């Protein structure tokens, strides 16, 4: 197979614009998948992806069409999984830009297009869902030209659902996507690891793009970053199931198994070469993203701690963006503090741990990384609110800020601007895309975004607004630590860092929520929120009352008083030794506290 017959491309789009459906149609049109094997979301192999209707993991598949070989790398569309997209694009020469004919350009479309431009990819604009009555392809073409700045006059109009014009997409891939540059099978092996996963029988399986050279079964491969070497036991391509081959050559995308048992030996973004003919300089990898949200994961059964550690190591293989370290909590025991790229990322990882590894997890409320400068000049990076230093020792607190670009219709402008103001946002600019659509730019503290901003934005705009963001650095803020006390004892896992102006409202909301979700006991439980020694909110969980006087009838009143006094003493003793069981809902309650509500 000569290089001029190979095409490597990805599909980029905003979530729900029909990316996985288009991938399905391409696989069917090229007979890679027969009609009998076909199903919705063929490349979304994870059960979670099928259920939620989203792509979480990238996937690489080889397609044979006439005398050409295509390598389609499917990418996620949600803002949390941008790192998956950047990995996919590093292995491609072209990208199909898919835009919904009814919704037009959305925030994540733009973010992914800019990533593709950074990688100098050939971009082919495709307008999907033209079969819908509300489709407006001409408006979308104008948007692509005005916002992105690429010629959309020849944009391909398709319906991935019905399969209309899929043949034109295939022809455009052949004509417009460049063949792999300077791929030479005679040079030393030069391959980029863009993904990996763990197989219980074979160990670590690597997904790789071969830029130069070739690799065969039995070759000794060398990882340039981890400096480890292994012998290849199996290799091949996906179409979309694994197909074994004898070798992978320059320009190809495939998988390699080398009986690697230690997950730390493989690093996504590393360069693969041969042990007996090494490269001197590694390939430029993609940029490693810094976690945005930090949360504590604790096993419900403390005996599962080592199982949770093993599960995190295996998931880290294919999800190189998560960072984690052990931590302990008085309330929850031993667990891990984990860094994620966003709340959906956190939600998906928790669900994967519970499904794939049969673990029961308690997740604490998410937090961002605060930079605290102490009066003695020391600087601390705090991701766990319970470790916040004493206020008297703090000179200044800085929190991360973002620049948010929100795409929305005119009718929702007022509501979304009000939401941004409530979240301590600073208005920067508004851009007019066309007669009805606007791009709103705000600077916002990340700590306000990670809780409920996305849900509220969708709610206020009936699902039509979308946003993406970039970090703009740290800024000093007047932040305080709010401790939650149950029965007079601090629950470290419920502590939160909030702006002083919102501390009272958030504390009132949280104590009310905790009162609802914590089960009643045989004694009264005060639920308090405190800043330092000052209590700023309180609710009381009423006790169960056993009617100890029910057996009395008539007789002396002192008998009744004696029984009630005895009950009171029993409850007092129980209160002093009783521990309050805190359910998972209590930790989720922090996510649901809504400072956008107006309090009278």
Swiss-Prot record:
It catalyses: GTP + H2O = GDP + phosphate + H(+). Residues 4-181 form the tr-type G domain. Its main location: membrane. Keywords: Cell membrane, GTP-binding, Hydrolase, Membrane, Nucleotide-binding, Protein biosynthesis. Coiled coil: none annotated. It is found in: Cell membrane. One of its GO terms (molecular function) is translation elongation factor activity. InterPro entries: EF-4, EFG_III/V, EFG_V-like, EFTu-like_2, G_TR_CS, LepA_C_sf, LepA_CTD, LepA_IV. Pfam families: EFG_C, GTP_EFTU, GTP_EFTU_D2, LepA_C. Transmembrane segments: none annotated. GTP binds at residues 16-21, 128-131. GO terms for cellular component: plasma membrane. It is a peripheral membrane protein. Its EC number is 3.6.5.n1. GO terms for biological process: positive regulation of translation. The keyword GTP-binding applies. It is an enzyme of class 3 (hydrolase). Required for accurate and efficient protein synthesis under certain stress conditions. May act as a fidelity factor of the translation reaction, by catalyzing a one-codon backward translocation of tRNAs on improperly translocated ribosomes. Back-translocation proceeds from a post-translocation (POST) complex to a pre-translocation (PRE) complex, thus giving elongation factor G a second chance to translocate the tRNAs correctly. Binds to ribosomes in a GTP-dependent manner. Belongs to the TRAFAC class translation factor GTPase superfamily. Classic translation factor GTPase family. LepA subfamily. This is Elongation factor 4. It comes from Metamycoplasma arthritidis (strain 158L3-1). The gene is lepA.
